[in-house]
Amino acid sequence: MDIQMFTTLNSTVPTEPVVGPVEPTVPTVPATKETGPSSSAECSTQPAVAEQEDNSLLAQLLKGKITSDDAKLQPPRGPFEYAPMLSEEAQFAIKLAGLLNPNPVTEQDPSTFKPPPKMSNNVRKNINLTPVIENAVPSGFELESPKDQAFDVVHGRLSMGQNQTCYFVTVEEMRRRLQSPEKLNSSSIACNLKRPKLKNGGELMRAQLRDHGIKVQLNAKQKAFPNKVIALVEAEAVHLGLDLGTAVRDDYPVQDIIQEVAHEALADEDADLDALMNDKDFTECMSALESVFTSVVPPITGIEPKPSNNMRLNNGMETFSSASHGLGIVSQRVWLPQLTAIGNGVASELRRLTETPTESKPEELKA
């Protein structure tokens, strides 16, 4: 939108209501992308007010006086994220300001921002008002910045309320979506990128992909059936895995499961208690499983890849990662600590129960 129009609109909107009778006027509509000012005559019908210092949120924002509490600012995390998360009022103020001045918190001038070559046009809009999440990666994985290879910036599907977030989508991620095992078609790719429906939207997206050396075959059969994973970009799927790991670590009922397994084993006459109490072999088995899981990290947006010497294992893990958009790779490690704790806990509980006198065992079972 024209910068002069923003400036004119800002100077004509009064900061305080006028006391006393006022002639009825036609209300004006704020200049946004969807609706511009209806006419210059409508803007001129605003009542005049005495000159005074403008203490509106917009003025404070432009003068650098806005506080962290007023705007609900979050600390910046890089040059792509100079615009912090703001309240709805502050977001509207930024839109009116046209992002003419540097952000008062990060001291970075938006006019100097240059997206990577061939990045889509909606990247600036998404980055300006919403923080881009880069570090939502579970422990045990090495971070890799996706900025230099960014193809697009997409709003998260799982954001709630005003806590809107964005995620980077890299060129290689788009290549993974279009190749095996999913081979997504143009419609599914547009769903993945949350692209709006346009008359020639498919053509524009295919042209953008061609600029990055990715050819989209028309009328190709999609291998993946429509599912909920298709709608998630890899960075958001990894973020979901991080939150799942936190929930499992904090709330999974390990002790309750240990008690239940131990008592069921004692009640089963055919149960091999010696095998269940052999926690040494169980620990070695779980340790070997963890070693395999951590030896391979297929390419995922925001995570440093790590191949193993077993090419067959690498290919299998990469296929699984592509089919699950990275969620399967990060979530498979979530359960290992809990399952290891359950196995060792069952062995300890069985030893404790079997050491009691024989006549007291039925009482233990009843409990």
From Swiss-Prot:
Protein name: Transcription factor aptf-2
GO biological process: one example: positive regulation of transcription by RNA polymerase II
Entry keywords, A to Z: Cytoplasm, Developmental protein, DNA-binding, Nucleus, Transcription, Transcription regulation
Location in or out of the cell: Nucleus; Cytoplasm
Stretches with biased composition (Polar residues): 36-47
Primary residence: nucleus
Chain residue ranges for the region called H-S-H (helix-span-helix), dimerization: 220-354
Protein's job: Sequence-specific DNA-binding protein that interacts with enhancer elements to regulate transcription of selected genes. Required for neuroblast and epidermal morphogenesis, perhaps acting in cooperation with transcription factor aptf-4.
Family from the record: Belongs to the AP-2 family.
InterPro entries: TF_AP2, TF_AP2_C
GO cellular component: cytoplasm; nucleus
Gene name tied to this protein: aptf-2
Residue segments, region Disordered: 29-49
Keyword Transcription tagged: yes
Keyword Transcription regulation attributed: yes
Any Pfam family: TF_AP-2
